[in-house]
Amino acid sequence: MTTAQSPTIPAGIPVRDTVVDLLIVGSGTGMAAALTAHECGLTVLIVEKSSYVGGSTARSGGALWLPASPILEENGAGDTAERAETYLRSVVAGSAPAERSAGYLRNVTGAVDMLRRTTPIRLSWAKDYSDYHPEEPGGTAAGRTCECRPLDSAILGEYRTRLRPGVMEVNIPMPTTTADYRWMNLMARVPRRGMPTIAKRLGQGVGGLLLGRRYVAGGQALAAGLFAGVVRVGIPIWTDSALHRLTTDGAQITGAVVGHDGREVTVTARRGVVLASGGFDHSMAMRRKFQSESLGEH
């Protein structure tokens, strides 16, 4: 006999009309917004359409572009916010507000510090994972990409099975990072780097199982770390709860109506709603409206 899976985390909390400070729609990196809000003293609720937590983040490579960040500084990358600003100005070329790029750069260090305080995530520099356009002013072939070190998903305890599975689940556990893939792909040409890398990750994965650990990497590690942080501070998550519509008082957003178990539930959000549910990239109409009218012409 199997026990039905609870639609809430923690289990047993009621799904009913409620009032919070901030509503987060989507349980991928929206969990980072939830943790930030919690640190600011706000009450937070996360709603997730599927039965799993992690969203598309858990199925991604989990890489973060973190220019002039503490991670790069600790590894002697020699990057600066000024160089990163020059690069963004070169590649974005006026297609987005300059203040948006400036705000991103201004908050990189704060974001890294927040992840370190609130989650078990530990980031490393994916050295030589080049910027997409290293030839542009401010670009760098050494790259500014950072990624999660392999993380033991067993820290989620009873909620480990609620983490969205990765795209490529294999029978042999081998938590592989982006940096690892580089040498694995070049193993035929550079076996002295490829073989030790494979042995290291295979040993970590199989050895971890023997010790009761379940290491994950990439987006799985990022999602698991954020999930662990959310569970630790008790931010509630409603799974199997899809956004139906936003509510408004005519002047501003006041919350949302979500569908759960065949009924509608109203969540009033005093400070706002964060839409982190993904799907935007699948709507060409929205992409043309909010990104560029020329998308899809070539």
Name each model feature, range by range.
Residues 88-98, 206-213:
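Short glycine/proline- and acidic residue-enriched helix-loop micro-motifs
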Residues 92-134:
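Long, well-ordered early-domain segments
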Residues 36, 87-90, 103, 110-117, ...:
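Alpha-helical scaffold segments in soluble metabolic enzymes
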Residues 2-84, 123-127, 132-137, 141-298:
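Residues forming the flavin
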